[in-house]
């Protein structure tokens, strides 16, 4: 998937003087990425019982994937890691636990990007610790420096 490159200096969220470039998908690219993910998930044979959207970037893709996979059971979970643009805390902290019981369930975790992979690793560990039978990760974008490679 090719996303548009944006200059952070032009964005209102960018701290003054920070030279940073990032990619921003449009709605069609997000939807097309979700179709690609749904096809990969179906082809793999993985059939999630619960889809967990990681707040906030994973909410929209999780909702779209729920339609594409025919799974209406969507939950949410929030992890705090970024303090500001390009500035992280020492470690991710789960600030909102998953909004449903996952014990014995196959769970698909959805986020927009696997950046460092720290947040997604924390989410996977937490869900397995809560008794999920299987946890798979799907992201629209994957950065090579991520410590976690998404399943989809």
Regions found by a protein language model. Give the residues of each.
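PRPP-associated nucleotide enzymes
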Residues: 1-152
